[in-house]
């Protein structure tokens, strides 16, 4: 609904939400966590910055891993993107992080099993594209959003602030992103599981899991109207 004020002012807009893949909605959390090696009761982080990767996000995630890996309390799935495949391991080596063969770290170039990863996650660190937010809200996941500044009219920032204004996410702008700020945000959110759950519930309240059905219904109504 917030997008309407940016559109030409005329009647006839219908808010449907963005379609979410059925696999995202149907993924089984317990099965996903078992398959991904998340221990019972262990908090799971999921982080990604797009298929190419983002240097600033990979740098901040390296600092995040340096913070949580020694304690071993968190399971962390991270997609480096194409340009982070060599960067992140180098940063982790420089920080002395034992990342190789670490059962609590799942570092890969790209996430091909997003339904399982989202189902397993308790907290997601991501950009703020429309489809990403549609998926996060549909499944009710708490998130730290880092909007890409390299988009038309800074729309990812506006997307992210919709969630932030409903206490459904924490937003860190890329110009303000540092390892210390990301660690502080994740540390605060994971320190209180009840607060993390509340953020997830606030996100879910914004979700439209049946957006595809809404779009189909509107198209059928339009077809029937013009067929007469």
Language-model features, listed with the residues they occupy:
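A short, well-ordered alpha-helix in the C-terminal region of glycosyltransferases
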Residues: 195-209
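C-terminal alpha-helical cap of glycosyltransferases
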Residues: 208-228
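Short, glycine/polar-rich helix-capping loops at beta-to-alpha or helix-loop-helix junctions
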Residues: 1-9, 132-133, 153-160
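Two-component system phosphotransfer/interaction surface
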Residues: 178-191, 220
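Donor-nucleotide binding loops and adjacent catalytic segments primarily
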Residues: 31, 38-124, 157-161, 165, ...
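Short beta->alpha connector loops at strand-helix junctions that form conserved
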Residues: 1-2, 17-18, 146-149, 172-176
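A donor-sugar binding/catalytic signature common to diverse glycosyltransferases
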Residues: 111-155
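Active-site-proximal region of nucleotide-activated glycan assembly enzymes
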Residues: 1-30
